[in-house]
Amino acid sequence: MMKSIILTLNDRAEGVTADGTRVPRALPGEEITLSKENQFKIVLPSKDRITPVCTHYKSCGGCSIQHVTQSFIKEWKSNVIKSCLSARGIETIIKPILTSEINSRRRVTLHGMKTKKSVTVGFFKKNTHELISTPSCELVDPEILSAFSLFEEITLLGATRKSIIEISVTVSKAGLDLNILNGKKLENQSIMKITALCENFNVARITWNEDLLANFLNPTIEFQGIAITPPPNAFLQATEEGQEILIENAMLSVFNSDKVIDLFSGCGTFTLPAAKRSEVLAIDKTKSMLSAIEQAWRETSGLKKVTSRSQDLFKEPVGKEELNSFDSAIIDPPRVGAEAQSRELAQSHIKRISSVSCNPKTFSRDAKILVDSGFKLDWVQPIDQFLWSSHIELVAQFSR
């Protein structure tokens, strides 16, 4: 055993020693003994260390930083954003981080497997394919947890012994929206059993291997009061509270715009609220999400004109000439960011950009492109929808 002191916490929530050894779940300032297998024991704990709230924390890979105070997490996540921007030579106002409540996660992906003797539904152990049962979870909405026995029955009826099924669950206004992947082909009797079970557990819709199994009610979601029925397994923000904070801040940048372009629009999280005051063009690769936007727009009175277009913005970013016809832009790319699209925005005449990101590194890379072209990064608002993990969401305003 070797004694070490943890110097810092990296952006994956791992403690780091002087020689660069990464120690998961160790904290800065702690004195530890470290084995050759990278197993550690605490000799002198950090003043910020606390007892994890979840009974599954030691084995579950869903959370990585339940062992530390919320004040530490807030400061650390804010510093991650600040460090990423500083590395690109960018300084700005970073607003106080806003954190979602416990048990507010409305979207979750569970996995299920069965053997001759048992059924297991839950999350994987960290960095493994070993599944552990997690009938309780401090992150997840209670409505999802109350249907845990349903997920076990679905696994029993729909999984093979050679594969693990994926159970994606979203809490909608009408009930649970279930999307099952990697399930076996169901016989009519199994379909009848599963649909009957779903009716007893307030399920609005269930799809099986991308085919609709049953639609009891339309699983609607609201964006600032505008109802939409997203396609199965559509991207949505993790918590409703976090979603509304992102929308509120994103609208600050486009408030006085006549025409707005929403890049990587998804199913309209920002498109539809922006349409309360502006004409909006929504662009995304996924046609089913654009169809959901169009339907919601048709069914909602009082909105300005919304149009949509299917386009792969990685392969074919919207060019500066087209961008010049818009007053402002909203951009919410995946974790890889939007380098090519940012270069087009930088060369356009657009005056304001609302940028939403779930990755401070790629956000900072793209921000550098915009700042170098004359944009100012006015502020960044961090939102922590992913309690006890290394993930952080942010929304930011660029202007010139």
Please tell me what each predicted stretch does.
Residues M1-H56:
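Terminal RNA-binding accessory module
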Residues M2-A13, G183-R400:
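Rossmann-like S-adenosyl-L-methionine
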Residues V169-G183:
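Carbohydrate-binding surface patches
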